[in-house]
Amino acid sequence: MTESAASPGTFACARFIKEIGRGPNGARALSPEDTHALYSAMLDGRVSDIELGAVMLAYRLKGETAAELAAMLEAAQASFALLRVPAGESRPVSIPSYNGARKQPNLVPLLALLLAREGVPTLVHGVSEDAGRVTSAEIFARLGIAPAKSHPEIEAQLASRALAFAPIEVLAPKLARLLALRRIMGVRNSTHTLVKILQPFSSPGLRLVNYTHPEYRESLAELFAGHPAAAVGGALLARGTEGEAVADTRRQVQIDWLHDGVAETLVAAERSSSEAQPAALPESRDADTTAAWTQAVLDGRQPVPPTLARQVETIVRVARQD
C-alpha cells in the first residue's frame, strides 16, 4: 500500500470521494475520464492509504456503472503487457479462476485441459491459494502442471501445450496488489470484478465470464453491449459455479455469446429434474481427489459430465469462428 501522508506525486482523491462516497442512494458516477485517471493512480500506487480505502469502500457500496467499469478495465489492461499467442485454428481462450471450490468440486482445470486437448490455447489466471477453498492452482499442481513464472513462460506454454496457468501476480502484478487488499479490508473491491473480465491477449481472445446474481448479469451485458473497447474479442457469459466460470454439473445454465454489440443465446437453460441421473463427480472436493478424478476423465476412465461437455463444445465452436 502507499504511504498515508500526502507526498509529491500523490494523486488527490477528495473530489472523487465526494461524488462516489455519498452512499448507495446519493452517490454519483464519475466521468469515464475521471474514473480512468483515478483507477490508473490506484494501480500505480499514487493514492494514499486512507484515500485508497475510502475509494474502495465507496465503490463497494455504490457499485460501478457500466461506463465506470469500462474505464477501469481500460486502465487495468494498460497496466500489464498483453500476451502474444501465435495465430492458429482457434483463438485463445481465457478463464478467470479467483473463487475456488467450497461446496462443489473445482472443475476449472478439467475444462481447461479438455479445451487444450481440442487445440484451443487456454489461459487460466487466478489466485494460488484461498483459505477454506480449493483453488485451480492447487489442482493443477497435483496434475503436474506448474504455474508460469513470467510472461514469456506463459506464452511458451500456450504455444507448446495450449495450456498455461498464470497467477495474477505474474500476469498483472499491479492488479494483484489491489486484489490482495481484501486480506486487510475484509471485503472485495472493484479489482475483483475487473480480473474476471480481463482481455489478456494482444490479439483478442474469447473470455469466459460468469455471474452469480441476475443483476450482475445485466450490468455485464450492458458493459459489453455499450462499450466496444471492453467487448473486443467477445465473451461467453453464463451463471458460474461458486463464482467459477465452469459449467454447473447439476443443471444446464444459459450460455450467451456477447459480441459485436449483441447477445446471442447459444445454449438455453434447462430445468433440473429430480428424475435426472446426477453426473459422476469426485467423492470429495479436496485437491488430491479432484485431481485424480480429473485425470481419470482425461484418460477415459470416467465420463465427462454432460453440461461440461456441452460447454467445451460451445467454446470450441466459437473460438474457431473468424
Language model features with spans:
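Phosphate/diphosphate-binding glycine-rich loops and adjacent basic-rich segments that engage nucleotide
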Residues: H151-Y211
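A generic, well-ordered mixed alpha/beta core segment in the N-terminal half of proteins
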Residues: G88-A156
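Flexible, glycine/proline-enriched loop segments at strand-loop-helix junctions
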Residues: L123-D130, E138-A146, R161-E169, P204-T212
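Residue-level signal for inorganic ion chemistry
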Residues: V55, F140, V195, V312
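Acidic, glycine/proline-rich low-complexity segments that act as flexible tails and inter-domain linkers
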Residues: M1-Q104, A116-T122, E275-S284, A291-P303, ...
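A structural signal for small-residue-enriched, beta-sheet-centric alpha/beta enzyme cores
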Residues: M185-A296, P305
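Self-splicing inteins and homing endonuclease
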Residues: L73-N99, P152-L179, R271
